[in-house]
């Protein structure tokens, strides 16, 4: 039996990476030299935060997004930690609030002023003190306001409620103490009811973040995970790490059964940590390697092989860290679906890279921009702590659109051809336009309207078929003969469509003449 390549239809097959011009990069940025395997960069629609080198303690820079070009060597820093800063994260519901963690075993919450910093910012709003050793990761809850998670080198995950009026919070609302080694990665599912962790003891765990109990645990010896990621509402986990032969590897897991991975994909023999990023709106997975010069991207599908390789973005400069712009900060006019900010230490440069879907039309592309998470929380901290779960508040990326009311996301989505959900209002609007389009040209010729409308519907129905085959439903050709047959069918279809266009033009001219005659005769009546 001969081998045939597997054809997949995907609107994201031709996505490409577009680096920013030199004028739109951030130059002369003193990026940290820390060996921690973190992103070291956090981005929102207003600011870029990047961990920097600082003597006598830890600090990070907060640069306005529009302030591109060369950075002033004396640019003000956000400093106040006694040890090196290891991680920074913007509050998803407040673009002017950021959390930082440090080797001094504390977490600090900062209010960033809307105007430009003129001097070093040393006054923090809150300080969280609870870890016994340095704190390596911080993560905001995706749906509840003012809930922050932290993990430290004391092998503990702590849950903090920032609604407290105290400026120094000494005790978390919950301490999760089930890990036997350092936590390397944390990830929430869409509504924040589950927390996944990757630990240095080679185990992946799925936890109940409120109860602190372990729901699932992976003891698979063939994959050593460094980073773990929930894949939206697909009930799947993706981890990146190394195989038993020390090759870099990705593994896909069922969140309800972590005994064996669903699939494994070996990449290469490099040693840099792989950072995965998942876009639930497009079902696309991006994999960025520390020290690499490229970005791999895949499309997640429900059918095997699940991870469908699309393309690879190449550049000349290796990245030490990476930042990602939230979807609400993208440029929809250029069909941008993802944006990275590469930290290039060899050139002290931050380079934006936009992932773009090539489209000819400049209008808003509804099919690649379904409703996405907004900057509004769906729960208060107390509601979440009491046991409530809600899906994120969604918003449309169409310019001028308002956030939608909180609504649950679909439990299962069609992965092979992701489409944007359409509101009933849009259907009603479309139906009214179609009805008007069918009546208006023939309002003066009522006796011809029924016959023409019936013919129009019948011919429009035929345009979907070619020689008895539905062009959009038939499978892709697998042999040369099938390909030729499909080509000839399409040629016939094009020829027939041209004839239909010619007929429509003749009908339009006839109608124009009849309307002109009626207008000329109307004064006499």
From Swiss-Prot:
Disulfide bonds: none annotated. The keyword Coiled coil applies. Residues 485-524 form a coiled coil. The keyword Repeat applies. GO terms for molecular function: actin filament binding. WD repeats lie at residues 80-120, 130-170, 178-217, 220-263, 269-308. Keywords: Actin-binding, Coiled coil, Repeat, WD repeat. Belongs to the WD repeat coronin family. Binds actin. Component of the N-Cor repressor complex, at least composed of NCOR1, NCOR2, HDAC3, TBL1X, TBL1R, CORO2A and GPS2. This is Coronin-2A. It comes from Bos taurus. The gene is CORO2A.
